[in-house]
Regions:
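Bacterial Sec-dependent N-terminal signal peptides
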Residues: 1-22
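C-terminal/peripheral segments of proteins
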Residues: 17-506, 511-514, 527-728
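A cross-family structural signal marking well-folded subdomains
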Residues: 520, 525-526
């Protein structure tokens, strides 16, 4: 009998497949993956399979900026309070309201096998990096898990969830109503710079070669995305910008298609006021003639306090509309938004592998790209613009700009609009499409969609100065090349400055200019062409004038019951304010300039600077440290090439923090060609040659040529290695 048992065990073991260990999986991925770093440190990652390529991509990202990779996941998965303390508990709770860790794991388990492999490869790439680099000490996450990408399935900064107030979450879920500061949890910059992007798609009728072209110009925080090239033998060959920690190229191109995202004004989130009925220990809410039970989910969150790790337990609530995020009086409010992480990851990754507009359109039919528009161009000469993607159907008799009555079934979302119902521009006869986070109804001149054809909830963004700036440039353009499209995208005219200073000059005609210096400054402004440059004294005068106006409290915030638009604020300063008020505030700006710089005759480049001192997420700017003059300006002025800034703690100068970060201009033909720019450099390591090798190029608008095809990559190769090996 004993012999029979032994034989049975041997037979069972021999028939059971050996489960590959994590270490064995790492080694196999590394063997199948090659990383070639070019002369700017851009990683060109070659993998046998898509999973191998993802493994190498995440390994390379960790090499370049592990801190930001980890920080993005600490925030996304809801563990920020373990580092930042109790103030971040409600950012963590917000993440769990939409998906618990258990649900994230279930989503991973329910994903198609190919997506599971990519998620495992994501975790393997980061864990292998940590194993091979023990000198790197994570802040919190010592082992990455394959379910984590379910929390970070879309490439925007924060995505939609950032719009859910952590303060309101605290007020609802925490009986302690102290005035404790609450952190949003996002890597957010306090620079008041409009977040957004520019996307231009150019048809062959407007280009010298006859090929379609694409401008990829996201306006994001500096160093928020790296530049990568990721290739597999399974059809992946994508180049562009990747948000740290994600395994797909978010803004970029392959050999046949290119995609660029701009922020959308589509209404993709709604609030439903729930009428709560308590029956003993049971909490229900009214829905038509019935009472529905609220889902009650306990969650325990950890936070650090005085060097100790503590824990707090919350009872989370969800209705069929979404999680309860706050209360309006006695009504509990559910906040509904797109939350389909599996489908979102599928759309984000498969987007990078499409070969033509038909395939791209089919991918867009997944309809999970909720916070963005998409500008598109391809090698067939097609150009297109998709305004929004995830758009719930609604009963237009209700006003969804305000919370709606959740007890009325008629307010429920009625599924999603079909892709064909959404705003789309395809191959307009004018030969170009533009979107600068502005209205879709000026995207292609008279060939733009018509506002009256779409429900109001499909669009909300008004026209802005960037859109006003772009339209005549594109209309008048011809025989465009990569270089001339770069010049167009960096056109230095500022329509906002034109409007503001024209109003000041008009005031000087109607009201006496009292000081000698004001008279002299106004004479200088009379001859200005409203173009920004490092030598422009006029630009400095204009910025200080706007700063003085903004801090004066004179600009109205509301127009009726609506918040006044950016164009409306400029209209007030240039047209509606009295001439006397305009001149008085201009005098204040001159006095501020003299205090800060000793003279009002200060060139723009003396004031407007680029500085990168270290790899920290938040730069501690210092006027005494080296910096570069930058002849760009904020997108608030209508600058297409945006340079958003903030002051340091004790600085007189302003320093760039956002705007043009990764920029690409792409031409599609028999072969794809492109030039790119990355603010600063590829690496966050101050000792790396690629920490600041693009800084002066950034200031000088000197783009680099992209090495896309392997023969070109090899010509530019500086180091070649498998993950885990020493670079050669």
């Amino acid at each position: 009998m004993k012999k029979i048992c032994i034989l049975f065990i041997i037979a069972f073991v021999s028939c059971t497949p050996n489960k590959e260990t994590e270490q064995e999986r790492w080694e196999q991925h590394a063997k199948n993956t090659e990383i070639i770093r070019d002369d700017f440190g851009v990683p060109h990652v070659y993998g046998k399979t898509d999973a191998d390529a993802v493994f190498g991509l995440l390994y390379a990202q960790a090499e370049d900026d592990f801190n930001r990779v980890e920080q993005n996941y600490i925030w996304a998965i809801g563990r920020l309070a373990e580092i930042e303390g109790e103030k971040s508990l409600y950012s963590d709770l917000r993440a769990k309201l939409y998906m618990t860790e258990k649900e994230a794991k279930e989503n991973f388990d329910n994903s198609p096998e190919w997506l599971q492999k990519l998620c495992v490869a994501f975790a393997d790439g980061l864990n292998y990096y940590l194993a091979k680099n023990p000198q790197v000490k994570p802040s919190l996450i010592t082992h990455f898990e394959p379910w984590m990408p379910m929390y970070f399935s879309e490439g925007s900064i924060g995505g939609d969830i950032e719009r859910v107030s952590t303060r309101k979450i605290k007020d609802f879920y925490d009986a302690d109503t102290t005035k404790m500061a609450v952190s949003d949890g996002l890597i957010r910059l306090n620079d008041n710079e409009p977040r957004g992007s520019n996307g231009f798609a150019i048809a062959g009728s407007k280009t010298k070669s006859g090929n379609a072209m694409l401008l990829i110009n996201p306006h994001t925080s500096f160093f928020f995305r790296g530049e990568v090239h990721v290739v597999s033998e399974e059809g992946l060959n994508a180049y562009g910008a990747v948000t740290w920690g994600q395994f797909f190229v978010y803004q970029g191109f392959n050999s046949k298609t290119g995609w660029m995202h701009t922020s959308t004004g589509t209404d993709i989130m709604d609030e439903f006021e729930e009428t709560i009925v308590k029956e003993g220990s049971k909490t229900t809410y009214k829905y038509g003639e019935e009472l529905k039970a609220l889902d009650s989910i306990p969650v325990s969150l950890k936070y650090t306090s005085n060097g100790e790790l503590k824990e707090k337990t919350f009872m989370m609530y969800r209705s069929h509309h979404g999680p309860i995020t706050h209360a309006n009086g006695d009504k509990w409010v559910s906040t509904a938004m797109m939350w389909s992480p599996i489908k979102a990851l599928i759309q984000s990754f498969t987007r990078t592998k499409k070969s033509n507009q038909k395939e791209f359109h089919e991918m867009m039919d997944i309809r999970t790209n909720s916070s963005n528009n998409t500008v598109y161009a391809d090698a067939d000469g097609t150009i297109a613009y998709y305004h929004g993607n995830f758009i719930p159907k609604r009963d237009v008799s209700f006003d969804y700009t305000k919370p709606v009555d959740g007890s009325n079934p008629k307010t429920d979302w009625q599924g999603l609009h079909a892709l064909e119902d959404n705003i789309l521009v395809l191959n307009p006869p004018n030969g170009w499409i533009q979107n600068c986070n502005s209205t879709p109804f000026t995207s292609a001149l008279e060939f733009s969609p018509k506002k009256e054809d779409y429900p109001a909830y499909m669009h909300s963004f008004p026209e802005n100065f960037r859109g006003i700036h772009a339209i005549p440039l594109l209309t008048n353009a011809s025989d465009l090349t990569i270089d001339s499209l770069i010049d167009l995208a960096y056109d230095t005219y500022l329509p906002g400055a034109d409007l503001l200073i024209s109003g000041l000059l008009d005031a000087a005609k109607k009201s006496p200019v009292k000081s000698k210096e004001a008279k002299e400054a106004i004479e200088l402004l009379k001859n200005w062409d409203f173009r920004v440059s490092v030598n422009s004294i006029e630009m400095t005068l204009t910025q200080f004038y706007l700063n003085a106006y903004s801090s004066s409290g004179k600009i109205p915030r509301m127009e009726g019951n609506k918040r006044i638009s950016a164009l409306g604020r400029f209209d007030y300063m240039s047209k509606l304010a009295t001439p006397k008020e305009r001149l008085e505030i201009f005098q204040l700006s001159l006095e501020k300039l003299k205090v800060d710089f000793g003279s009002w005759k200060t060139p723009w480049g003396e004031f407007n600077r680029y500085q990168r001192n270290d790899g920290e997420i938040f730069q501690d700017f210092n006027d005494a440290k080296p910096s570069l003059a930058v002849g760009m300006a904020s997108s608030s002025w209508g600058a297409l090439a945006s340079f958003g800034t903030r002051f340091g703690k004790d600085t007189k100068r302003q320093y760039g923090t956002s705007g043009n970060s990764f920029v690409a201009v792409v031409e599609f033909g028999d072969k794809v060609t492109a030039k790119t720019m990355l603010a600063g450099g590829q690496s966050s390591d101050v000792n790396s040659p690629h920490f600041s090798d693009q800084s002066q190029r950034y200031a000088d608008k000197q783009f680099k040529e992209v090495a896309y095809y392997r023969e070109d990559v090899l010509k530019r190769a500086k180091t070649t290695y498998h993950p885990g090996e020493e670079k050669k």
